[in-house]
């Protein structure tokens, strides 16, 4: 929802004034300044008045209020214009720029920083690390450039003494991916001299006030500002900037940006070398010029990583090449001082340009492929020096004010002139609005052959000694009739102008008197080649790379370089062309007073700025004109989805008719005009409403496209999956067939083999058939087993099954299972085993068969048993398919105990060769015995007993638990005990003895 300011703050947009007049404009501007509302709109132009105090209107909360909002929805603010430029760039994939203009001290630099801060804050919602790194470096670059390029002037404590234009590159998602900085005309003369009340660049004061004692000692510096000739003028001046604190901020910023420690140290060394250069004094001894303090030369040589004698020679001599001859021409004292100052200025300028270049290298767009990432778009931010009128205006002010004339001309061309011409060209009814066109002043300065710069260049190229006075005379003769140029010679009664020194230009911002003193010298920008060779031969690679032209041979003839004014003019023309190619947004900064006071609003001072900035004319054009215009084709391409008559394609006679239909459908026909090739929309609100309708339709279109595309993807995915499954199925079938064919080939004729194919190696199956191979091998093994079983007599099959059962239960857990011998089972009836008693046992067995009706005898054997009273006796066990009988062989095999097999829960045997076995019963009355044989002795029968019992239980589909352990756990009438087995050498036969935990079975040793 739109939020409007209360009327007590005046009109938030000058376009809304009741009458367009200077008094009402100024009254509204004053009211808003006094109420703390420093920003006011003129349509899409922001007028900013410097408050000269900190305001709490730039925090995160304020950023969120303006993020993604339209201009009319929020009160005027820099963030509103920044968001508008960002949205235009993102919506239309069109490069935009924000031009910040105004005179020195009007707040341009601060405005540019807040705009950068806003753009950084609203981008990269996904918090990508690389984007955050780029944003951080873009923001940090500001304070580094301010330290080396800004200075305190009489009008501004943080005045930009260079021009800066920064391009911020964005990817197709609108996130910053890099940038590039262009710098213009650093005021390097400030290095060696400043006007009263002003300082040199901040960097010198920050180094001296913020550098550690150890650092200053290494640079041979002391904290006293007044000790250095180049900066002593501003040594006692108070500044709102904390130099010591800023030193640390700048050093940290350089590290964050990516400057290497040795590069940062080189920058400090250059600053120190310049300060020491300023303290160099020259004396004359006869015809010889000497350096007063040779120690300073050594210090400078150390800081610049070169030799002392080379520094001294460069300061005192100039190498002149005449044909093949090379001579050293000694300087006069005046020439040496001039060379020293030129060297100091050049070193600082190279340092500054190198810093800008390094920042550009680091923040440059990397790995950006438009075919992959889409078109990169740009937002340009121009923060350049404002219009300046000082007590003494020299070459630098001339260039700065020319720059402002060019920017004003751009504003006139785009906002006032081109707009009105476009209305007439398109046939839109329009009443012409008069305005001052400063093209005549721009031509006065830059016109080929006739402009001031051309005349200055001609003077510099003349052979012989050319003076500034001669240059002024040339201006008088060639520009004497120009209405915006005058001098004392042309206007003898004007005593403000000095003879042979001053000339006046009537700029759009007011009359400025320039002193020609230094124009020739500053335009030539002479630096002897000796200094360039000196720096190129430095052992410091950073310094060496700053002076590539130093590698030229002494005798090499070079072309005359372009003059400083021409270089600046060319850069300004390129800058304006660059800005004109983008969609511009303007911030017009106004300085309320010259005292830097937050309370004073100087009406006359502000009115003058409003007049020369053309703000009133801007209001008139905006009120009478249209906020937006677009060709019918592009307009239709963007908004056609809003109307059913134009979506997806229209069938009307022309795009113009289609646009009319669309506008009427939306009900905006009263707010538009139709030109020959373009539609014109009067109010921004209509455009914003169109954008909202488009955004709503885009959601529906995107959902529809997503639905169709997802359906298409699903069908494609299904077809691919189905095809893949078909391929997999057929491939698996092929692999199975191949595998089975190979198995069939290898196992062909195994019935005739002696081992029925046991030696045949199985082929390696595919991974998917591993389980199949296991099943197939199991089938083969069962078949092979059946073939082997066929050879076994039927009478031996029960014994075989019992042995198999024993192996399954005991293999790997007991050493001797008795598998190699025949298992008789009923050993009590065997005469070899019991020759004396077998005849007695058989009748007892028959009687039990009659009585208990058992079918088969499973096992019988003599045993030694122990009971719960620790009594050990010889007994026998007789196991049938129904019962387990405990018998006394000494009493003709009298049955002492009968245990039904269904009451048997399991067996426990030890893991040794002993014959211990425990029969576990449900009533916890376990039977503990040790099997023994008489003939042969020590025959192992445990495997046989376990096998026949397990096999019998299996035939009845019951499970018999068999435990193999030592000691063996058992229960005698509910009492838990253990039976452990020990081997003793002198033990004649197995025997049980009592111990604390149960019993010990002692068996004979080997």
Curated annotation (Swiss-Prot):
ATP binds at residues 102-109. The modification N-acetylalanine is found at residue 2. It is found in: Cytoplasm; Perikaryon; Cell projection, Dendrite; Early endosome. Residues 9-695 form the Myosin motor domain. GO terms for molecular function: actin filament binding; ATP binding; calcium-dependent protein binding; calmodulin binding; microfilament motor activity. PANTHER family: MYOSIN (PTHR13140), UNCONVENTIONAL MYOSIN-ID (PTHR13140:SF417). Belongs to the TRAFAC class myosin-kinesin ATPase superfamily. Myosin family. Binds a calmodulin chain via each of the two IQ domains. IQ domain 1 mediates interaction with calmodulin both in the presence and in the absence of Ca(2+). IQ domain 2 mediates interaction with calmodulin in the presence of Ca(2+). The TH1 domain is required for activity in complementing zebrafish defects in Kupffer's vesicle lumen size. This is Unconventional myosin-Id. It comes from Bos taurus. The gene is MYO1D.
